[in-house]
From Swiss-Prot:
Chain's gene name: betL
The family this protein is said to belong to: Belongs to the BCCT transporter (TC 2.A.15) family.
Any one Gene Ontology cellular component term annotated for this protein: plasma membrane
Record protein name field: Glycine betaine transporter BetL
Null mutant phenotype: Mutants show a strong decrease in the rate of glycine betaine uptake. Mutation does not significantly affect cryoprotection or virulence of the organism, probably due to the presence of other glycine betaine/carnitine transporters in the cell.
Location in the cell: Cell membrane
InterPro entries tied to this protein: BCCT_CS (IPR018093), BCCT_transptr (IPR000060)
Function statement: High-affinity uptake of glycine betaine, driven by a sodium-motive force. Involved, with GbuABC and OpuC, in osmoprotection and cryoprotection of Listeria. Does not mediate either carnitine or choline uptake.
Remaining remarks: Activation of preexisting BetL protein in response to relatively low salt concentrations represents the most immediate response of the cell to increased salinity. GbuABC system is most important during prolonged exposure.
Induction context: Constitutively expressed. Up-regulated in response to salt stress and cold shock.
GO terms for biological process, alphabetical: amino acid transport; glycine betaine transport; response to cold; response to osmotic stress
Membrane spanning stretches: 7-27, 44-64, 85-105, 134-154, 184-204, 224-244, 256-276, 311-331, 342-362, 392-412, 440-460, 464-484
Organism: Listeria monocytogenes
Means of activity regulation: Activated rapidly in response to an osmotic upshift.
Record's bilayer topology term: Multi-pass membrane protein
């Protein structure tokens, strides 16, 4: 068995501390973490916006630069997974259950509850609702994941470094990357991963329970949610023990097929013309305003500033907190692709799918609110999707497909997380032992269950977002480190705007 590292014990201690606070002092812990989170979003919102903008610009630079032809692996090495399986796995890990949870609920909230641009229920509010949903789940989120994944994949497969966050900083930290500073960085990454995934497990259990309640009258309580977590835990641990090539790959492919079926059925059975017209209009609006939205802080408009802090800054912090987990997993499955192929595959295609997903489900929710069930916006977040389906022909069938999708996404996210946590706490092993994966799987399930029971899930989510602040500094250092190493290799390989044939063969 691989030896457990100081990162395991250090991160385990922090997680235990957070869980104990959440379990025994849930209200105080929520107040404490909420205060810190609001302080960070209110005072450092500008910082989060600039960090994400830097990430996007750097990714664009790499795609357009000759550096983009460098391969993440040995010269001429082929990818280990087909394009379909690669996309399925990275997409399932990166968004997963969040798309189902927020696909209808977020645009509806922007339209009917709190519009980003002013008065709710207006045509302008509808356009803004979709535009901002595209913005929150589009290229910005995927660029954050991509840059962390790229740094890890490059240093692991090109430089043969350990698969650890700290190992990506060796060019600028030197020996300190292997010492206490490097271990602290890895501990923050593991803490953010454990807390973020445990929160998602809790939210997933709530959404499945909410769907069962809405559809079949099943009680909405902790007993049902705990039963859901137990069943899902057994399934994802069986998948985790079967290995990456069997369990996660198979489940991810199933995810994509089921998600595709649900998307197409909703588009056909729902208000198709309304969806496509508003998708086209709002997508153009998104492209036209993406730069302005990326830097908007609204310093002279208190209401708009509050909305930006609550949504955009919250999302940027959330994606940053999830980037260690998703980045490590994407890096693990991306060997053999060029930097350009990697970035286009991780950013552009997932962003387009996410955008269209919100157009279909968010557009459907807004249509129902306008023309059918005007009380849709008063439903709990986890029930909005099922409320939308209830207004469509074949609504029960759609709801059942959605429940299956939530469950499979649920299993895949937890499965991927146990794999990543196993890697991070065994020195970056690409194939961590089952015993370590099972340990992390049980811990995640236990954390989610305890905090669902105690009511401390929101506080745990706040803690994860707080961890995003120090990790954002790590990401900036990763960009600098990656740039330093790539420019050195560019000079070594003689890469220019038009490399010669002989030079391409060296990549």
């Amino acid at each position: 068995m691989k030896k457990l590292t100081n990162v395991f014990w250090g991160s385990g201690f922090l997680v235990l501390l957070a869980v104990l606070f959440g379990a025994f002092l849930p209200e105080q812990f929520e107040t404490f973490t909420n205060h810190i989170q609001k302080f960070l979003t209110s005072n450092f919102g500008w910082y989060y916006l600039i960090v994400v903008a830097i990430i996007i610009i750097f990714c664009l630079f790499l795609v357009l630069s000759p550096i983009g032809s460098i391969r993440l692996g040995k010269p001429g090495e082929e990818p280990g997974y087909s394009n379909k399986s690669w996309f399925a796995m990275l997409f399932s890990a990166g968004m997963g259950i969040g798309l189902v949870f927020w696909g209808a609920a977020e645009p509806l909230s922007h339209y009917a509850v709190q519009a980003p641009g002013g008065e709710v229920g207006t045509q302008a509010a509808m356009k803004d609702a979709l535009r901002y949903s595209f913005f929150h789940w589009g290229i910005s989120a995927w660029s954050i994941y991509a840059i962390v994944a790229l740094a890890l994949a490059y240093f692991k497969f090109r430089k043969n470094a350990p698969g650890l966050i700290s190992a990506t900083l060796y060019p600028i930290l030197g020996k300190h990357a292997k010492g206490p500073i490097g271990q602290l960085i890895d501990i923050i990454a593991v803490f953010a991963t454990v807390i973020g995934v445990a929160t998602t497990l809790g939210l997933g259990a709530q959404q499945i329970n909410g769907g069962l309640t809405y559809l079949f009258g099943v009680p909405n309580n902790f007993t049902v949610q705990f039963t859901i977590i137990v069943i899902v835990t057994i399934l994802f641990m069986l998948s985790a023990m079967s290995g990456l090539d069997k369990g996660i790959q198979l489940l991810s492919n199933v995810n994509i097929y089921v998600a595709g079926v649900l998307l197409v059925l909703t588009l056909i059975l729902g208000p198709t013309l309304f969806i496509m017209n508003n998708f086209t209009n709002s997508f153009g609006d998104y492209l036209q305003n993406i730069i302005q939205m990326s830097f908007q802080t609204a310093p002279d408009a208190p209401d708009a500033r509050k909305w930006i802090d609550s949504w955009t800054i919250f999302y940027w912090a959330w994606w940053l907190s999830w980037s260690p987990f998703v980045g490590i997993f994407i890096a693990r499955i991306s060997r053999g692709r060029t930097i350009r192929q990697f970035l286009l595959g991780v950013i552009v295609l997932p962003a387009l799918v996410s955008v269209f997903w919100f157009a279909v489900f968010g557009g459907s929710a807004i249509f129902v609110e306008q023309h059918g069930n005007s009380g849709l916006s008063s439903l709990a977040t986890e029930q909005v999707l099922f409320g939308v389906f209830n207004e469509f022909p074949g609504g029960m069938m759609l709801s059942i497909v959605a429940m299956i999708l939530i469950a499979v996404f649920f299993i895949t996210s937890a499965d991927s997380a146990t794999f990543v946590l196993g890697m991070q706490t065994t020195g970056g092993s690409l194939n961590p032992p089952n015993s370590v994966k099972v340990t992390w799987g049980l811990l995640q399930a236990g954390i989610a269950s305890v905090l669902l029971y105690a009511g401390g899930l929101t506080a745990l989510q706040n803690a994860s977002i707080i961890a995003a602040f120090p990790f954002s500094i790590v990401i900036i250092l990763m960009i600098v480190s990656l740039f330093v190493s790539l420019t050195r290799e560019q000079e070594k390989l003689g890469l220019y705007v038009r490399p010669k044939k002989s030079q391409r063969s060296q990549l």
